[in-house]
Amino acid sequence: MPKSPPRFLNSPLSDFFIKWMSRINTWMYRRNDGEGLGGTFQKIPVALLTTTGRKTGQPRVNPLYFLRDGGRVIVAASKGGAEKNPMWYLNLKANPKVQVQIKKEVLDLTARDATDEERAEYWPQLVTMYPSYQDYQSWTDRTIPIVVCEP
């Protein structure tokens, strides 16, 4: 049974906040080439994930915490533990071709859900990197997807 999430988590206010904070962080990231402000948040490295909007066909950019595993980039579709998956996750399910920017490096990758074995490997690493992921999982009935982006 999930813990009680923050009251605003599944409200339109939360979506508005996430949208605008993502835009601000993306702007800072690009302005600084992922160095310093914008390139990390709470001392955790940030990458920019670009998906194609499933309805608009337009590029959609989201700053996300990430892990590297060789040529792979691993991200969690947490949306802060909200009831629904983030829009970027729905976009990559419709079109798995993504671009990931890590500092000045831009990678053209293909995204997919982690296998059960990969999930068992990556989830503990994600939680070690950002312990709030464990809280996020406790706030929702959905299993937070782990996305593997690979060449």
Swiss-Prot record:
Pfam families linked: F420H2_quin_red
Activity at various pH: Optimum pH is 7.0-8.0.
EC assignment: 1.-.-.-, 1.1.98.-
Membrane-spanning ranges: none
Superkingdom to which the source organism belongs: Bacteria
Residues that coordinate or bind coenzyme F420-(gamma-Glu)n: 54-56, 60-65, 76-79, 87-91, 133
Keyword Cell membrane applies: yes
SUPFAM superfamilies referenced in this protein's UniProt entry, alphabetically: FMN-binding split barrel
Family: Belongs to the F420H(2)-dependent quinone reductase family.
GO MF: coenzyme F420 binding; oxidoreductase activity
Compartments where found: Cell membrane
Reactions listed under catalytic activity: oxidized coenzyme F420-(gamma-L-Glu)(n) + a quinol + H(+) = reduced coenzyme F420-(gamma-L-Glu)(n) + a quinone
Protein name (record): Deazaflavin-dependent nitroreductase
Keywords: Cell membrane, Membrane, Oxidoreductase
Effect of K79L: Loss of PA-824 reductase activity
